[in-house]
Amino acid sequence: MLRGNEAEGVVVAGRKSEDEVSLVPLLPIAAQGGSLNDFVVSVKENDCERVVSPIRGADFAMPVAGDSMAPEYPAGSQIFIKKINERAFIDWGKVYVLDTCNGSVIKRVFPSDNAEKVKCVSINPEYPPFEVSYEDIYGMYRVLLCMSVK
């Protein structure tokens, strides 16, 4: 995912001045709603288009691909995410994007029986849960908002 400087995403409701609107990088890779693949992508911030964040605190936006997180996070929707320190605190049961050595994936995250891993669970029951080792996670991003066309 994003390597280098990270933008701050703060939007002040009701403000129309361009100086007061928050633009966040739209990552040119999708969070896979499925299982991890073997594709590693490194993105530089200046390679990213910027989009207006409709929510305070978002660091990045990215598209969702696949249907494992449908219907809440359908393919083609755009999510706004915030980087967290996964070593300090994880809000178990919430949806995160995990940037891993095998690609980026969007999943509901739970503790694993193995203290060195997290359990990733899809909303769509057709997709089985899987585990990811902390050492394979480059970053965890809490999903703050999902926008989709209805």
PLM regions: where:
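Acidic/glycine-rich C-terminal interaction modules and beta/coil loop segments
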Residues: 55-150
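Short, positionally conserved secondary-structure boundary motifs
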Residues: 1-75, 85-88, 147-150
